[in-house]
Amino acid sequence: MPVIFMERSLLDSLTEADIKEIIDENEGHTKYARLEGYYEGDHDILRHRKKDSTAPNNRLVNNMAKYITDTATGYFIGKPVVYSSQNDAYLAALQDIFDYNDEQDENMELAKGASINGDCFEMLYLDEDAQIRFTKVPPDGCIYICETGYNTPMAAIRIVYSKDKDKNIIKKVEFWTAQDCWYFRSINGGALELLDIREHYWGDVPFVEYINNEERQGDFEGVITLIDAYNRVESNTANFFQYNDEALLKVLKMGAVTSQDIAEMKEKGAIILEDGGDIQWLIKEVSDTALENYKKRLREDMHIFSAVPNLTDANFGGNLSGVAMSYKLWGLEQICAIKERKFKRGLQRRIELITHI
């Protein structure tokens, strides 16, 4: 979901055509699709092609992106958020709403989404029983519009795709301001048609942004090139072994032989050559030490630059003192401290919207 900034005076003068233009320019942000793909295991290596179609072309995905996000998210919000208030009745009413929305799971998914994409969004609405609900919005399903110089929203655009009974692709668009909501629809990629404008009672734009950091950068976004390099070297290692498993046999001065002769040689486990003859496999050679050192360096760099440690490393054994362990986790503690401050801001806005309605 891209975040765009504009002057408040421009928002007040937006026309139906302006809203359509904003959607056309910002829908389907490629950054989010790529990051979501990497988390789910859809890496660039899977689209790698070789010029020689007969050569081994293993495409191995080592999903460090998922490891980084799952580890950082679990460490950050594995324990549920605890709320406190001097007003016990208010806190109890708020907790009822949270329980109704399975707030603990929602928070986990929001934190994971922010870890992947750098930010994540939530929409508040009233269900058919007039109960307050809040739900995560898919990263490619919304456009967040903020006033220049501020992070609070002036408007938000929600986009939902579906199919009707005739399998037509229906695109529904909602343009939310603090006062009303504009409803649009298009069929099979046609022009958006304004259907209705309705007032709402939230008193604000009912959307919340949860950011991972001030730069809105995902936890593994900065190490994607390292992930790609590791995927390549692992794939090439597999190619190397497969090539050697299927290596050609070079034979010099074997003389005239028949298929029967070859069958007998296989049975006896011996090959008879003429004088000066030779036989050897055509194999590739590689330095195991150099290869393993290179892979080790890539793994270490991914952990260093993501600040997410390798928890399976032998150095995380049970013999570490508390001080030594804190040093090992220092980088992760720092990024989680940033996450906590940013996530708290989103939770506060959620509570403000709930309280206002």
For each of these PLM feature ranges, what is it?
Residues 1-135:
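Extended, helix-rich architectural segments
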Residues 111-116, 146-149, 164-167, 175, ...:
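A general structural signal for short secondary-structure junctions and capping/turn motifs
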Residues 86-90, 98-107, 114, 222, ...:
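Short amphipathic alpha-helical segments
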Residues 112, 281-292, 333-340:
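Short, charged/polar micro-motifs that form catalytic or ligand-binding hotspots
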Residues 29-33, 75, 79, 100-108, ...:
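Short secondary-structure junctions and interdomain/linker hinges
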